[in-house]
Every structure is written in C-alpha cells, then in structure tokens.
C-alpha cells in the first residue's frame, strides 16, 4: 500500500517517528480493530484509532445515546441523544477522518454472534462495562488467537492490561487474574456508583495507546501486567499477573485437551 499525498500530510507526525514511519503507517491503514462498546472507554479509543489511521474500525454496541452519557462519552453529542451509539460514533469518526472505514454492529455481543464478529478482526479492544462480555471476550480471543486489550473503570480508578494467552507460558488471560465473575450486584455499575468522567478518558486513551503499540509492534506490552490508575492519589502502579496452570480458559489442562 502506497500512501497518498493527503495521507502523507494527515499522518505527518507519525511518519517522522523512526518507530512508525511509512511502514508503520501502512500497517495501521491495513489493520482491522473491533471496539466493544461506544461508551466512556470506547469513545477515546475510537477517536484516537480513527485519527491514527487504523484502516477498519468495527464498533459493536446495542445502546442508544442518553443525556447522562455525555459527561464522559465524548464521541457523542447532544444533538445525537436517542440515536444508536454506533451510528452516532460513526458520524463523529467520519468527521475526524473520512479515510477510515467504520463497520457498525448495532447489537449486544453474545455467545451467538461473538465468534463470527471477532474472527473478522486483527485485534479486540474491550470498552464494555459488564463482566459477561469481559469473560466471553477472554475465552473467544484465546480460542481465535486474537490480542485483547481490556480496561475497566471505577469512580476514581481504572485498570488496563493486554492479553495474549495463546502465546503460551508467561502469557496469562483475564481468567488467570479473576477466574470467575463476582456475584451479581457486588460490583455496582456506573449508573449506580458514578464516575469522574475524565477517568474514563484517561483509561480509554491509554487503551488506544496499547492498541496502536500492539499493531505496530512497539515498546513493552502490558501482557502479563495489570496497570492500575488511582486518580485521587495521582498514582500508577503495576501488578504482575501469573499464568494459572489450572485456568479454565488457557491452563495446561485446557491446552492439552485442545492440542
């Protein structure tokens, strides 16, 4: 793929980076990324991936824009309240970069559609806000050998990691960290607990950085590490994630059974 004159100008600040250059930008333009959720995390992920020139971006979300979303879901606007989030996000991304292909999936990700959707993309960025989706993505990205970049939010904190458990030893999955979802109601959702809107922006932007690094093969990966952000104390810290040999998704027994 040869860059056009317009692309040379648009991506000029990428092209002057030795770590990116023309070859890296061509990788981004050829990449296909599925973003799960067009909410607080998904908004900055989508905006930065589109601006960076990720060639095809899939968005899956079955929700509609609500006025309460606009405090943190910056890919949407007041005039789009009531619209499907995937349509609202597509309009915003087209205004940012009309050279990017946006594929919308106005549905809830579930066992009946997830495998077919994920199979069509190179990488999955999880911006969802529920445990069922998180565990479904964990299991299917392992099975389909797709990198999974995932973040989670609480009122003043965020967590972020990258998962490539299909690479074997030293590469844990989400279930190695949290084997099973917590009991229903134990962890309140955003509409119950609240959130400082900019915290979602910080974590979604960091997630976009990790997606771009994964696509470009740059720097250190968060694979095997959980990054935790504490906004009130202005702290980041990292926790190593050990690969669980008994993990029901990627453990030794599972690998032996499927090999």
Regions found by a protein language model. Name each.
Residues 1-259:
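Adenine nucleotide-associated cytosolic modules
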């Amino acid at each position: 793929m040869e860059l056009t004159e317009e692309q040379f100008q648009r991506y000029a600040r990428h092209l002057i980076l030795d770590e990116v250059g023309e070859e890296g930008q061509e990788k981004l333009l050829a990449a296909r990324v599925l973003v799960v959720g067009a909410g607080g995390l998904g908004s900055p992920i989508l905006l930065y991936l589109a601006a960076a020139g990720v060639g095809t971006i899939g968005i899956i979300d079955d929700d509609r824009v609500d006025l309460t979303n606009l405090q943190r879901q910056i890919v949407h606007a007041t005039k789009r309240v009531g619209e499907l989030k995937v349509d609202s996000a597509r309009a915003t991304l087209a205004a940012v970069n009309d050279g990017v292909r946006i594929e919308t999936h106005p549905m809830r990700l579930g066992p009946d559609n997830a495998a077919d959707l994920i199979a069509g993309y190179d990488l999955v960025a999880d911006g969802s806000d529920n445990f069922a989706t998180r565990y479904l993505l964990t299991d299917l990205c392992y099975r389909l050998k797709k990198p999974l970049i995932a973040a989670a939010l609480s009122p003043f904190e965020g967590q972020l990691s990258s998962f490539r458990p299909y690479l074997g030893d030293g590469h844990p999955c989400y279930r190695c960290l949290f084997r099973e979802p917590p009991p229903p109601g134990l962890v309140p959702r955003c509409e119950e607990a609240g959130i400082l809107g900019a915290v979602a922006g910080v974590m979604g932007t960091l997630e976009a950085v990790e997606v771009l690094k994964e696509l470009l093969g740059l720097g250190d990966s968060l694979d095997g590490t959980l990054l935790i952000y504490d906004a009130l104390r202005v702290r980041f810290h990292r926790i190593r994630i050990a690969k669980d040999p008994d993990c029901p998704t990627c453990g030794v027994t599972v690998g032996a059974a499927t090999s």
